[in-house]
Amino acid sequence: MSEADASDAAPTGREIWIEKYRPATLENIYGQEDTVDRLQSYIDRDDLPHLLFAGPAGVGKCVTGSTPILTNKGIRQIGEIVGDVDGFAPAPQNLKVCSLTADGSFQYRHPSHVFGKRASGLQRIKTNDGATLTVTPEHKLLIRTGENTNPTWVPAADITAGMHVLRAKNLPIPAETTGSCAASKNASEVSHIGDEYRYHDSLMADVNTRIATLERLIEDYAESRSDGSLKFTLIGAHTPTVSTVSYLLATVGIASRHTSTLIDSEKRVHAIIIDASDTVRLEEMIETDWDTVMADQTTTVTSSSTASTTKTTQSYLSSGETQTCGWIPYADGGVTHPSTQHSPLHADVVTVSESLDAEKRVYDLTVPGVRNYVGGCIPTVMHNTTAATAIAHAVYGDDWQNNLLELNASDERGIDVVRDRIKNFARSSFGGYDHRIIFLDEADSLTDDAQSALRRTMEQFADNTRFILSCNYSSKIIDPIQSRCAVFRFSPLSETAIRGQTKDIAAAENIELTEDGLDALVYAAGGDMRRAINSLQAAATTGEVVDEETVYTITSTARPEDIETMVTAAIDGDFTTARSQLQTLLVDTGMAGGDIIDQLHRTAWNLDLDEETTVRLLERVGEADYRITVGANEQVQLEALLASLADTQ
């Protein structure tokens, strides 16, 4: 089965939608406008207290697969790394990707997760230097919008022609390969390179091998131009790829430009161009005795004269990082250049930003801490996918992950969790913010002793830590903790809120959802957004239209009219019909007795009954609910309920 066929056969994938569509920002929360406004006011004032969330359960970016990325194993297509994963999955343990760190250097980091999905409505970005990126509209690139503005992450959909996208110019090689290369140990071994794999191997080699490979590439594929620039012409299956040459040049601090020309309607000629000043530097590197330089272990960066070039170059060739320098782009023959030759970033003008009406499988990586990786045929800094709680996003922005600890008390209940994990996180050092956040879900599952220990911890670390506790029942949280928190009580979601998000998800997943199917989902959810989303995903697995019949079948929920028929028959004295309808719900529909009680309670005031009869029905429902809760037989109690209604006539 092809990838497209597989996608059509299983439109819902293997993702868990309640995680996929969990609100990432306060603006994404449906149906709790007043609570969101209060929370936002704390954040706007930079005065976040301890918080206690109480309420019922359930209230409350990417590139295409052919995109090459720089890893500790060389250049690999991201589609090969992620594979056929749908949604998030753990990343391979031995994988590292090249990422831009906060101090402006490039390092190799372990990604925590990989991500894959089908997506339509892509965005294509083209630059003056020949870079072409096809990404989802929300995927972010590092952009500078004007001459004197700082770089910011901008979604692809908001990028326009004239902006400057930042690309990697000085790339390190992985620390484990620095100084040696299993495939090519010295320059003599690259004297005859017959295919792309050898070039790829030399990309991860020591400086001797990389410089020797570049020398061979110049001999075989390059020509000097009248303006002093150098042009590599690549055509045919046995020439190195554009990405290999571009990345190889970037490991020695040289930015390149890519152009392509279609000839004979079927053959494409690619060219890699480096400007005159970088050509001179490359020639100096080729003439340098790198064995002597490496032996001296020179690491001093000096940029005051041309004679210092070898010292400067060696420092970023032999380490896992690069120097950080300011840069100001200026035009020279259509190519933008950094203000100094040692800047790790290169500014490239966006020429085209266009929407594509196409559907493709897209991929991403999550790199903790730095949240970016180097990718593209010409190395470009790209943002990665991430998700977190809305408040952490609002307070810390992109730095939420280093300042948030999430625990679930129902999984890890007891006093040891409070004493160990929470205290260790609260004590660990951090900088740049007044406090960190510890989020404890289902806090009402903690024992009283654990809550007492938590209260002492909240007091001890009040200066640098804020706690957010979530629970279903605030009455199960001890008073000393409640008194230290701003309490937010989340009400069950309205039908309008559930209807709105359910429709949005159906549209995002290309699901045909009928109006009666939507009504059934809202009814079955009963104010629980998680149940609505789970029910929608379950109904969509059939690959058919999600209608009323599908929803009631999937959720084992009785239609409101079936409940009304049963109750009305009992009140009219037709116990036989009422009992038969009850049997249908228990046996054919597969409902539990407790679920029938819940539906009776929810629909009592919507039935066409007078007030006295409704009160009597609710009284009987309460009695049956209590008896079933303490262990009585469900069918016996429900039949007794119907009999009592019939007996009053």
From Swiss-Prot:
Gene3D superfamilies: 1.10.8.60, 1.20.272.10, Hedgehog/Intein (Hint) domain, P-loop containing nucleotide triphosphate hydrolases. One of its GO terms (molecular function) is DNA clamp loader activity. PROSITE patterns: INTEIN_C_TER (PS50818), INTEIN_N_TER (PS50817). ATP binds at residues 55-385. Signal peptide: none annotated. It comes from the Archaea. It holds the Pfam family Intein_splicing. The keyword Aminoacyl-tRNA synthetase does not apply. GO terms for biological process: DNA repair; DNA-templated DNA replication; intein-mediated protein splicing. InterPro entries: ATPase_AAA_core, DNA_pol3_clamp-load_cplx_C, DNA_Rep/Repair_Clamp_Loader, Hint_dom_N, Hint_dom_sf, INTEIN, Intein_C, Intein_N. GO terms for cellular component: DNA replication factor C complex. Part of the RFC clamp loader complex which loads the PCNA sliding clamp onto DNA. Heteromultimer composed of small subunits (RfcS) and large subunits (RfcL). This is Replication factor C small subunit. It comes from Haloquadratum walsbyi (strain DSM 16790 / HBSQ001). The lineage of its organism: Archaea, Methanobacteriati, Methanobacteriota, Stenosarchaea group, Halobacteria. The gene is rfcS.
